[in-house]
Amino acid sequence: MAKNILIVDDAAFMRMMIKDILTKNGYNVVGEAENGAKAIEKYGELKPDLVLMDITMPEVDGIAALKKIKGSDPNALIIMCSAMGQQAM
């Protein structure tokens, strides 16, 4: 059975690229969010098997969203990714 994945990134182009790669490899993208606030909301609604989340986003950043999601579901699987490079967090 295909794994259900939630993609979170403020860049629509990145969401589209990630979704394309995942679906071509047999994964089911159940939702997308453009910021951390929407990610928290969508996680609660969809309960995906995995979340792929950007770090730097408007409204609520990925780190804050990660903490909120893990606070409500300690078993949540979340991969954080970013194009930040070597900047200090």
Language-model-derived ranges and their functions:
Residues 8-9, 33, 51:
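Conserved sequence signature across two-component system core domains
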Residues 12-31:
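Two-component/phosphorelay signaling modules centered on CheY-like receiver
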Residues 35-38, 61-64:
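Acidic catalytic/metal-coordinating carboxylates
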Residues 44-46, 69-76:
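Conserved phosphotransfer cores of two-component systems
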Residues 46-52:
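Active-site beta3 strand of CheY-like receiver
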Residues 57:
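Receiver (REC) domain active-site loop signature in two-component systems and cognate sites
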Residues 84-87:
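Short, conserved "switch-loop" micro-motifs in signal-transduction and mechanochemical regulators
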